[in-house]
Amino acid sequence: MSNEKTNVAEFVSELQAGVFEQQIATAINSVAGATVEHGRGGEVVIKLKFKHIPNTAQVNIEHSLSFKKPTKRGSSSEDLTYDTPMYVGKGGKVTIFPQDQMDMLNPQAKA
C-alpha cells in the first residue's frame, strides 16, 4: 500500500467543481450564526457514499450536505445531494484526474 494519502482539502474542493465546498462554508456560517442568535444548537452533516464505476479505476461519490439551524420559533433545515466521479490511484488515493495522466504542457515530465 502506498504512503500517498488523499489530499482532503483538494478532494473537497473538487466535489461538484467546487460548489459543494462553498455550500459547506455557507451552511457552517448559517448554523453557527443562528446558534448564537437563538441560543440553541444546530447541526451540519456531510455524508459520502462511494460506488465503483464498472470496468474502471473510478468511483462515483455521492456527497450529501444537510443542516438544521435554530430559528425564533423552531428550526429550519436543508438537504443537498450531488454526484462526482473520481479516480482511485495507488493505495486508494482519490483524485479528480488519473495519477498517471501525462502533463500536456510538459510531455517530457514524468507522471
What feature does the model see in each segment?
Residues 8, 19, 74, 78-80, ...:
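Compositionally biased, non-globular sequence tracts
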Residues 3, 60-62, 100:
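N-terminal functional modules and adjacent low-complexity/disordered segments of proteins
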Residues 1-15:
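Histone-fold modules and their flanking histone-like tails across chromatin and transcription assemblies
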Residues 36-76:
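Short, structured protein-protein interaction patches enriched in aromatics and acidic/basic residues
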Residues 9-12, 62, 83-85, 91:
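Generic secondary-structure boundary/loop-capping signal
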